[in-house]
Design a protein with these regions (language model features):
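The feature represents the first ordered module of a protein
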Residues: 2-76
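Low-complexity, compositionally biased segments
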Residues: 18, 25, 67-68, 82, ...
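Surface-exposed loop/turn and secondary-structure junction residues enriched for glycine/proline
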Residues: 32, 63-66, 81, 93-95, ...
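Alpha-helical membrane insertion/targeting regions
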Residues: 56-59, 107, 117
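Short, charge- and proline-biased low-complexity linear segments
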Residues: 65-81, 109-117
Length: 117
């Protein structure tokens, strides 16, 4: 049995949350996180989508495991990240690292767009 991830509860509590991260410009984030049976595609037992959206609703950043990515083989973990128009595999370690990586990427994109300094 794997040790319990102490940051998992924090991630699960974000399910359904929509947070405005730029009230003046309208950027917002959305969290969809649910427990699912562990499988080769979702070995951590989570179905998740963490996204940053622009004022027009366009997804700018996304970390999810909803579909396969071109560089992965069938039956491998589906974890990946979207950054603007680029999709790359993501090496899921634990919920805390997922949240830190997501918020770090959100900050980077908001800086590039001149939303934050």
């Amino acid at each position: 049995m794997e040790p319990r991830d102490p940051s998992l509860d924090a991630l699960l509590e974000l399910d359904g949350q929509v947070l405005v991260v730029d009230p003046a410009g309208g950027h917002w984030v959305r969290f969809v996180v649910t427990r699912v049976p562990a499988s080769p595609e979702k070995p951590h037992g989570l179905d998740y989508s963490l996204t940053l959206h622009g004022p027009d609703g366009e997804r700018l950043v996304g970390f999810d495991n909803a579909h396969t990515v071109p560089t992965r083989k069938r039956g491998e973990a589906l974890d990946h990240r979207h950054r603007l128009r680029t999709v790359r595999p993501y090496a899921y370690r634990d919920a805390g690292t997922l949240l830190a990586d997501f918020w770090g990427t959100v900050d980077s994109v908001l800086r590039e767009r001149g939303v934050i300094a």
